[in-house]
């Protein structure tokens, strides 16, 4: 590994300061840091590259921040499959499981090739209108179709592999990966899914029919959702960060992406320890 990309929350002085220290650490070892211009101007770094070009150049990506920062970088990396080392400087940190004290030892191991990655499923999401695809993206956590604040409940006709499932009458619908099962889906009473399981979760948001419950389907499933409601404000949100308006008759198709996100794992904790810590299990 020679080229190490750094992404950080530029509005967090602590993240910016650590990014500056990391650049110096890399240079002292004869490595080439890659920093997007927006961050570079905060740390007086001349080793810049356009944000969209970084995944093609980097051998490793270091993310300083929280899960939100890592999720946005995972979408950017996309098919490139560069390993991502997430350093938790945020609050919750299900994905950024490397602590600040672990960062430099973890980097040393990565440079020696002595590291393990957790491969996480990503989704390919496309929005179709009038028979044509008008948007297509990859997501790591979840896809959410929900109504605006003043809209009534919406009707979402849902198929799995071309077979009719039901028409959800609800405030919305969440389709999550196992990684995303601890996000919005969990708040809507969805199950916690181990990230190595090969499945997707369909979770209704405040369904009108009380027997509508979250359902787990195959990771190879093609989920098709059609908006049947008329004159309602409805939105498609990807990973809680990118959004599009959905109109009557639009169709949303969701399936496994071709590539996975590769997250460098912590040596000091496992998935269940992360769950216990973040969800405060066993505390009184």
From Swiss-Prot:
Annotated compartments: Cytoplasm
Cofactors demanded by this protein: a divalent metal cation
UniProt keyword list: ATP-binding, Cytoplasm, Kinase, NAD, NADP, Nucleotide-binding, Transferase
Active-site residue list: 67
Predominant localisation class: cytoplasm
Entry function: Involved in the regulation of the intracellular balance of NAD and NADP, and is a key enzyme in the biosynthesis of NADP. Catalyzes specifically the phosphorylation on 2'-hydroxyl of the adenosine moiety of NAD to yield NADP.
Protein name: NAD kinase
Origin species: Geotalea daltonii (strain DSM 22248 / JCM 15807 / FRC-32) (Geobacter daltonii)
